Amino acid sequence: MVRRTHGNSQEHVTKHIFVTGGVVSSLGKGLTASSLGRLLRSRGIHVLQQKLDPYINVDPGTMNPFQHGEVYVTEDGAETDLDIGHYERFLDVFLSQKANVTTGQIYQEVLRKERAGEYLGQCVQVIPHITNEIKSRMRAQASDDVDVIITEIGGTVGDIESQPFLEAAREVRRDLGPDNCMFVHVSLVPYISAAHELKTKPTQHSVMMLRQLGISPDALVLRSDRPLNQSIKDKISLMCDVDAEGVVNCVDAPSIYDVPKILFEEGLDAYVVRELGLPFHDVDWDEWADLLERVHHPKHEVNIAIVGKYIDLPDAYLSVTEAIKAGGFANWAKVNVKWVAADRCETTEGAAAALDNVDGIVIPGGFGIRGIDGKIGALKFARETKLPALGLCLGLQSMVIEYSRHVLGIEDANSSEFEPDCANPVIATMEEQKDIVAGKGDMGHTMRLGSYPAELEEGSLVAELYGTTHVTERHRHRYEVNVAYKDRLREGGLRISGQSPDGELTEFVELPQDVHPFYVATQAHPEFKSRPTKPHPLFAGLVKAALDHQAAR
């Protein structure tokens, strides 16, 4: 543990590392923060992570996936930024709602306090009231058993929206002291092909802008598409007044899982340990080295399609993609993810063409009627051709609708989400969600969210894959399998292989293995609990089934 000495007594201090970004967005601040966190964790240091998002939305739960990408759900039901998924996967930890803070949350709380009279008549201002609230969120995860909090500040230095967050970070350093706080700035060193030169000026200007806000970075992570020589690093060290040891190069890598190794070889984690006075232990590479061996030296290769409606922005399915890849790692297989627009699969011919040369499909979650007929068409094709299929959330609902229409003969089977007055709503609005759907309540943070238990049926494929009949998974939905149709589904051959403990909510469905080798769906989002070093059993099972399908061709 990290201690601060006061006379003869010692007080634990949770230290802070702030990760900022400059020049352009999408440099990989989240992956840099995650990789540094992984390295510190591998040195025996207890690390938690956090993302501060400058947008005014309270959370990303109501944002368009094409704008924001995936909404990542935590164990306690927070709808968060996709970077929280990177943090959990790299550190192999469960984070809470404290891990994601937005401008909307900050202003909402400050205005609540103002209306309640908690500021005792003060004129409420950005400084100190907004910044104090930000600081309290920054420190919310600090405790006696947490050594370091790594906080990623979203956006790019110079954005007007992020200035209160940067000011709050500056004040945290002032409050805790420079020995307990560190700033890591991620910047771009672009290559100008016409001049055949790498340019340092953008980084110099980015650091200058950061200094104008009262922050001098302690370390620079320089992103580039080719290695930087020592003379460029030395120049940046001099011009930006950063120790030479703190200037590291993170060149583009074949896999995101290579980034911890790159930063280690550049010495970033050792530099951070020294600067913050953390206990020095060697990095335990055993688990990560095994992962990299599976990433770079697979024994098999297989194609799996994601049939979705947001495929133009792959980040909308980031955790699904990473979970599929992790399922490949479990089987020493490289998985080539094929992106298939659901609309292409609305007809039998379209599905056959779109899913040609794939050995498995995933039907991910989503909202709204667009693309639903294509998802149903893809599942019909997979069921009839014995193509391995895994449905997630809306994927389960699509599987139930498809089976009801084409096997049970309920031609007008549908979901009340898509057809509120349908005669056969095999998928119905959850009772507690009806007022929300009717417009009588807030849409934000009102779905069935977070971790819930399920009981699996003995002898089912899902119970075999999990190795237990008691599981918990994370959820994000308003609709469920209509209990009035459960007996009819069972009698028609669709196995309800997992339910909520009270037996009301259908959590898993599947076809018996003598009917189909792998036709499984869950109402949950198991992708959120997958780790590259601990692949989720459903995704590992899908990849294994895909390899078997490939071998049988």
Swiss-Prot record:
Its UniProt miscellaneous note says: CTPSs have evolved a hybrid strategy for distinguishing between UTP and CTP. The overlapping regions of the product feedback inhibitory and substrate sites recognize a common feature in both compounds, the triphosphate moiety. To differentiate isosteric substrate and product pyrimidine rings, an additional pocket far from the expected kinase/ligase catalytic site, specifically recognizes the cytosine and ribose portions of the product inhibitor.
Which residues hold UTP? S25, K199, T200, K201, P202, T203, Q204, K235
User: Which top EC class applies here?
Assistant: ligase
Q: What is its EC number?
A: 6.3.4.2
Record-given protein name: CTP synthase
Chain residues that bind L-glutamine: G366, L394, G395, L396, Q397, E417, R478
Provide a GO CC annotation, any one.
cytosol
Q: Which CDD domains match?
A: CTPS_N, GATase1_CTP_Synthase
**Gene for this protein?**
pyrG
Read off the InterPro entries from this record: Class_I_gatase-like, CTP_synthase, CTP_synthase_N, GATASE, GATase1_CTP_Synthase, P-loop_NTPase
Annotated family: Belongs to the CTP synthase family.
What role does this protein play? Catalyzes the ATP-dependent amination of UTP to CTP with either L-glutamine or ammonia as the source of nitrogen. Regulates intracellular CTP levels through interactions with the four ribonucleotide triphosphates.
Pathway in which this enzyme or protein is active: Pyrimidine metabolism; CTP biosynthesis via de novo pathway; CTP from UDP: step 2/2
Positions binding Mg(2+) in this chain are: D83, E152
Q: Which GO terms describe its molecular function?
A: ATP binding; CTP synthase activity; glutaminase activity; identical protein binding; metal ion binding
Q: Name one GO biological process term.
A: 'de novo' CTP biosynthetic process
